[in-house]
């Protein structure tokens, strides 16, 4: 657009305030400003006027959008449109003194002009906010409104004056002063988490800071100790707390610098296993390093590479960690050197891995008779141990139980290093003078208390005419039977690794003492490959294996009298050996009392209820009389039917008799009084309504029914109950029918069927009828049917 200043309707009159013109002047605001022209928004009327920059009286560089100006109105000769001429910038009014405090909401972008230069008179803007009467207001500002050479950032605290443009009504912030820069975000690592709050170890100072879970900006379920976070510190109730907590990528926060070089030193102070109450030092351990100037470095329980116990005097290798926050040095990545045992005063022992469990195991010791417990964490050099591996270790008392020992600092040894015995091939004969016993059965848990020590046995033997004795251990006996006093044995002599100590090994039983006492008993229980014998006093039961029975095991029956000897096997358990079936020579000492009593079983035999500790059963007299309430014991001999299984609470009839070597009055000839009804009968078996144990029904086979009677449901029967020793299940035998049950009466036809039949109308001619036109034909003993199958049309009869 071209403009000629001489084309104005002012006849060359200058029209400035100092001139003589009486033309009316108006005021307005620069709305748009370009290189050579611009536009003015009139203040007194709704008009927008063009002006040429040549009409401005002053430095054009000082003129910008929003400035108040005074001007005259003229008209363009070419277009006739009104234009503004003779522009004068109006001086700004004095700003009010009241200043507001606020905060930068959106800062003016940095380097905006270099990226996209603005046109003359146009400046980038930002926004600030302030609060008044609980309400927040937002204002714009430009870089020219900031006092001093200050670059504002979002979040900065500021002080400013509110400016209201009377021409446009726009409100903005002017004379902005920076009060406080926004606090930088801090970083740290979550070190502890409680129910509703946690603590962060700060990355700038050696200090922890509290934070509430409501301040965590993210999924709280994913937050866990060790996570890197950033946060803002605020003051609440006089204490610093972390707010606006956010997760950082793992590895962002680094507290310390670890040296690449490895150092060697000596442990001068170990970390106590049980810290004292007044111990506040987080790094209680000490390692001495021989630098030019000797120095002691602290270390904590997390600075060791493994959980192997450290001892004073240990030679170790480590790195030095320097804390970035306070420059504190400490030893870390500590590992025990292989030659450390040359400098410590510990007594090392050897053994073989005997058992491995989940996280712990047991070592068979060369110099100890008990197996030594150890934790996997005590294995040196990160080796993985297996059963039969040879190891070296140190024995220390358990911190939780001083009566127990356990192995620490376990080092794997080459195969063939550990030797339990060095014995000759020469065999000796001797006689047992003292029996050897085992320790308590081994447990898989280290927290069962102190185990009982095993006791050595003594063997007397003759060597070149000299009578000598030698010790032997129960674990060195061959076979399952332990030798007893007076038994003849064969053995070898071995030198253990303990200096100057000889023991008998490979001990084999040659013969029992001929003077050993033979005992009588009665077969009480028969299992698959073992059984139990009731003693002659009828108060205990003795285990025996079928391999100890002389004769055909199938010929043994419950109640048979047997003769046996006692022996102690592994685990100090007493068992019967050399069991022989004998005749009843020392049975009942007196005739049974002919009086028959009625009673109730208040405790069954142990073979019926294995959970009870007592072997004998007990019967209480229930019939009226002087003896009512008296209780008498019974055993397998007292049963009329030795295979009968008496349950607690069953009614019985019995006699009294003096039995056993101690002449004890016991129940004898016990017969149960059982009556019940038949529940149902299948093909070859049935069930009786009788409760035994957890079962409400009692099984019986039809071959157990006496006299070949066919039982029906509802029949009342008497029977005996036998216990299958192999399966542990009970069944009925010797089933007698006492009386027949009620005959089954045909049930009447249900009413619904009767009503349905009544509603059928046979005379209804319209009802559908089914008529048989041809009976089906079967095969005629030929190679198929004579009539060929053809495709027929439905509903059409040939």
UniProtKB/Swiss-Prot annotation:
CDD domains: CSP_CDS (cd04458). SMART domains: CSP (SM00357). Keywords: Acetylation, Cytoplasm, Isopeptide bond, Phosphoprotein, Repeat, RNA-binding, Ubl conjugation. There is a cross-link at residue 91 (Glycyl lysine isopeptide (Lys-Gly) (interchain with G-Cter in SUMO2)). The keyword Phosphoprotein applies. Gene3D superfamilies: Nucleic acid-binding proteins. SUPFAM superfamilies: Nucleic acid-binding proteins. Signal peptide: none annotated. Residues 26-87, 136-179, 186-245, 297-337, 349-410, 447-507, 519-579, 610-670, 674-735 form the CSD domain. It is found in: Cytoplasm; Cytoplasm, Stress granule; Cytoplasm, P-body. GO terms for biological process: CRD-mediated mRNA stabilization; IRES-dependent viral translational initiation; male gonad development; negative regulation of nuclear-transcribed mRNA catabolic process, deadenylation-dependent decay; nuclear-transcribed mRNA catabolic process, no-go decay; positive regulation of cytoplasmic translation; positive regulation of translation; regulation of translational initiation. The modification N6-acetyllysine is found at residue 81. It holds the Pfam family CSDE1. The modification Phosphothreonine is found at residue 761. GO terms for cellular component: CRD-mediated mRNA stability complex; cytoplasmic stress granule; cytosol; Golgi apparatus; mCRD-mediated mRNA stability complex; P-body; plasma membrane. It comes from the Eukaryota. The modification Phosphoserine is found at residues 123, 276, 514, 584. GO terms for molecular function: lncRNA binding; mRNA binding; RISC complex binding; RNA binding; RNA stem-loop binding. Belongs to the UNR family. RNA-binding protein involved in translationally coupled mRNA turnover. Implicated with other RNA-binding proteins in the cytoplasmic deadenylation/translational and decay interplay of the FOS mRNA mediated by the major coding-region determinant of instability (mCRD) domain. Required for efficient formation of stress granules. Component of a multi subunit autoregulatory ribonucleoprotein complex (ARC), at least composed of IGF2BP1, PABPC1 and CSDE1. Interacts with STRAP. Part of a complex associated with the FOS mCRD domain and consisting of PABPC1, PAIP1, HNRPD and SYNCRIP. The interaction with PABPC1 is direct and RNA-independent. Interacts with EIF4ENIF1/4E-T. This is Cold shock domain-containing protein E1. It comes from Homo sapiens.
């Amino acid at each position: 657009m071209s403009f000629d200043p001489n084309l104005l309707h002012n006849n060359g009159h200058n029209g400035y305030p100092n001139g003589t013109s009486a033309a009316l002047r108006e005021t307005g605001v620069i709305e748009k400003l370009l290189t050579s022209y611009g536009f003015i928004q009139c203040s007194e009327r709704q008009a927008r006027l063009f002006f040429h920059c040549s009409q401005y009286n002053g430095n054009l560089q000082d003129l910008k959008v929003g400035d108040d100006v005074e001007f005259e109105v003229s008209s363009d000769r070419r277009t006739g449109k009104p234009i503004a001429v003779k522009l004068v910038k109006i001086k700004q009014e004095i700003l009010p003194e009241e200043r507001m405090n606020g905060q930068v909401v959106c800062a003016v972008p940095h380097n905006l002009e270099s990226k996209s230069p603005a046109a003359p008179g146009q400046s980038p803007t930002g926004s600030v906010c302030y609060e008044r009467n609980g309400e927040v207001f937002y204002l714009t500002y430009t870089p020219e409104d900031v006092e001093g050479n200050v670059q504002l950032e979002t979040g900065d605290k500021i002080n400013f004056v509110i400016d209201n443009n009377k021409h446009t009504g726009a409100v903005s912030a002017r004379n902005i002063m920076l009060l406080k820069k926004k606090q930088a975000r801090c970083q740290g690592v979550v070190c502890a988490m409680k129910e509703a709050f946690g603590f962060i170890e700060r990355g700038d100072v050696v200090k922890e800071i509290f934070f509430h879970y409501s301040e965590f900006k993210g999924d709280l379920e994913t937050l866990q100790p060790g996570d890197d976070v950033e946060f803002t510190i605020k003051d609440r109730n006089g204490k610093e707390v972390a707010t606006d907590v956010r997760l950082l990528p793992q590895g962002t926060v680094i507290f310390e610098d670890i040296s690449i070089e490895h150092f060697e030193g000596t442990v001068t102070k170990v970390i106590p296993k049980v810290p004292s109450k007044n111990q506040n030092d987080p790094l209680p351990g000490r390692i001495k390093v021989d630098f030019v100037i000797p120095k002691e470095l602290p270390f904590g329980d997390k600075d060791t590479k493994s959980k192997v116990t450290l001892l004073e005097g240990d030679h170790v290798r480590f790195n030095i960690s320097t804390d970035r926050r306070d420059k504190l040095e400490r030893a870390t990545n500590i590992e025990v050197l292989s030659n450390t045992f040359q400098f410590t005063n510990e007594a090392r022992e050897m053994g073989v891995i005997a058992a491995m469990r989940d996280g712990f195991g047991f070592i068979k010791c060369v110099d100890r008779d008990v197996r030594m417990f150890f934790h996997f964490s005590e294995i040196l050099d990160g080796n993985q141990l297996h059963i039969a591996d040879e190891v070296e270790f140190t024995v220390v008392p358990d911190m939780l139980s001083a009566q127990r020992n356990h192995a620490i600092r376990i080092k794997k040894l080459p195969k063939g290093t550990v030797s339990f015995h060095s014995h000759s091939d020469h065999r000796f004969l001797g006689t047992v003078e003292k029996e050897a016993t085992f320790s308590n059965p081994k447990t898989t848990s280290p927290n069962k208390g102190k185990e009982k020590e095993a006791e050595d046995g003594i063997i007397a033997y003759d060597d070149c005419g000299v009578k000598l004795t030698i010790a032997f251990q129960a674990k060195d006996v061959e076979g399952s039977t332990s030798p007893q006093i007076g038994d003849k044995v064969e053995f070898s002599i071995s030198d253990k690794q303990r200096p100057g100590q000889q023991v008998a090994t490979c001990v084999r039983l040659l013969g029992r003492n001929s003077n050993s006492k033979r005992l009588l008993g009665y077969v009480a229980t028969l299992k698959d490959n073992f059984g139990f014998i009731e003693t002659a006093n009828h108060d205990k039961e003795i285990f025996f294996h079928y391999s100890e029975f002389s004769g055909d095991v199938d010929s043994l029956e419950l109640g048979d009298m047997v003769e046996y000897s006692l022996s102690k096997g592994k685990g100090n358990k007493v068992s019967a050996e050399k069991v022989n079936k004998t005749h009843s020579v020392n049975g009942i000492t007196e005739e049974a009392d002919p009086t028959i009593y009625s009673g109730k079983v208040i405790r069954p035999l142990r073979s019926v209820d294995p959970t009870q500790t007592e072997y004998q059963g007990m019967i209480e007299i229930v019939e009226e009389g002087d003896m009512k309430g008296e209780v008498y014991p019974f055993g397998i001999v007292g049963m009329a039917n030795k295979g009968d299984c008496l349950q607690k609470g069953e009614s019985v009839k019995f006699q009294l008799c003096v039995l056993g070597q101690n002449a004890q009055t016991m129940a004898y000839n016990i017969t149960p009084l059982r009556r019940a009804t038949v529940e149902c009968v299948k093909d070859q078996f049935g069930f009786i309504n009788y409760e035994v144990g957890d079962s409400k029904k009692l099984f019986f086979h039809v071959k157990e029914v006496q006299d070949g009677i066919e039982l029906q449901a509802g029949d009342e029967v008497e029977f005996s109950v036998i216990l299958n020793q192999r399966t542990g299940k009970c069944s009925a035998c010797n089933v007698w029918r006492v009386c027949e049950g009620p005959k089954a009466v045909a049930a009447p036809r249900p009413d619904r069927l009767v009503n349905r039949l009544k509603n059928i109308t046979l005379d209804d001619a319209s009802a559908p009828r089914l008529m048989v036109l041809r009976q089906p034909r079967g095969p005629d003993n030929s190679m198929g049917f004579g009539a060929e199958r053809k495709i027929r049309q439905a509903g059409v009869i040939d």
